[in-house]
Amino acid sequence: MISCTCYKGQKVALFGLGKSGLAAAQALMSGGAKVVAWDDNPSGVHTAKRENIPTRDLQYENWSEFVALILAPGVPLTYPQPHWVVDKARQADIEIVGDIELFVRARNHFLQHSGFRDQDVPFIAITGTNGKSTTTALLAHLLEQMGYDVQMGGNIGTAILTLKPFVKKRIYVIECSSFQIELTPSLQPTIGLLLNLTSDHIDRHGSFAAYVQAKRRLVTGASYAFISVDNAVCQALYQQLLDEGHQVGAVSKEHFVENGFYADRTKLFSVCQGQRHMLADLADMTALRGSHNAQNALMVLATLQALKISDPHIEKYLASYKGLAHRMQQVRKMGPVLFINDSKATNAEASAPALSTFNDIFWIVGGQAKEGGIEALRGFFHKIRKAYLIGEAAQEFAGVIGSAFPFSMSLTLENAVHEATVDAMCCKAKEAVVLFSPACASYDQFKNYEVRGEAFVSFVMQLKES
């Protein structure tokens, strides 16, 4: 665990007792802070009590005694309206920060008192609308394969303050959501990666401009940044950073870049002063199929170069990466039919990589629709043999599809798996693909995308070969 001494001897309020909140409370207490924790969910409060974390309903506390509110990233800060605990903190005029800010302050304290430099204990921060988790996991995997001391956490699922304490040459690879960045005013990573920016989480940020601004802070604060320039918003941001004098590199999965990193199909290149150097070829790496994974791999290789890390076996290490659960995860091959779990695709843009990668698709789609639905995926409609519509979005998506291709109102995931399997097995394609890429949130029928993905895997594994 990383101990946080920034509030030593002071009283802090903490709201949100999931994994990251519980870890933050323990880290603060070990650093000498007086913590009062609470959550709207009674189970979180119960867990905190079991871990000897002081709990009291913050609605009835004297907020003039607190110096800060430590807030879980899932709690609304501004939109659609501030949570009551945020209003309390603002009325008391105290700072509101999250667990990544506590990590940043603890690291800064360590660097100041140890005499080490930023690059002696590298902090890699990764953000973007889609691809964050894969890039985070792939970078950590390669560093581990090369023998480095690596700690991976943040939005990928491991609470950042549960990671091992700071020591020289330990590398921290951290996935950051826009919500976490909002709560991290001191964010200054050694290297910051921005993968892409498309409309998402507008319900929490109020506007796309506010969402972009949150993501921008990660790269503007970085000692060195890499930005994908395949998107107009990111290209403009890259140019802004260059004009402002930031150390920033360009990455493209679509076209040549003058100084930076780019992909030509499966081949990955770096370009420096007009000289092109091939870094790796992703051909036949099933866990890194698709142009989106070429971008993820480019970001990882760019980071390694910035860290001055090289290894002659880099392709072997890339090939050994197994991929993440729920992200274009190959579940099973049954005869000529391939089953793919892409449950982490919670919006249209996140479904695009899978739809672009495969052909002869039997698409299971639906759930709780995001703004824009599946309109952005029309360019892939020619690849779809049939769709199986589930959840709240079924009727809406049926209207969008119209007569573009056949569809079934399956409504439930179990029905969809069985219907899609029957149709795919009868298909004469060399390899038919039953693709579960819902392009929607899961909350209408499942607790989260992980539970939804596990349900899909379970239904697929129960299928009997005929």
Curated annotation (Swiss-Prot):
GO biological process, one term: regulation of cell shape
Positions of transmembrane segments: none
EC number(s) reported in the record: 6.3.2.9
SUPFAM superfamilies reported for this sequence: MurCD N-terminal domain, MurD-like peptide ligases, catalytic domain, MurD-like peptide ligases, peptide-binding domain
Cellular component GO terms, alphabetical: cytoplasm
Gene3D superfamilies: Mur ligase, C-terminal domain, Mur-like, catalytic domain, NAD(P)-binding Rossmann-like Domain
Keywords, comma-separated and alphabetical: ATP-binding, Cell cycle, Cell division, Cell shape, Cell wall biogenesis/degradation, Cytoplasm, Ligase, Nucleotide-binding, Peptidoglycan synthesis
Pfam families per the UniProt record, alphabetical: Mur_ligase_M
Single Gene Ontology MF annotation: ATP binding
Statement: the UniProt record of this protein carries the keyword Nucleotide-binding: yes
Recorded superkingdom: Bacteria
Localization, UniProt: Cytoplasm
Function: Cell wall formation. Catalyzes the addition of glutamate to the nucleotide precursor UDP-N-acetylmuramoyl-L-alanine (UMA).
Name used for this protein in its record: UDP-N-acetylmuramoylalanine--D-glutamate ligase
Organism: Bartonella quintana (strain Toulouse)
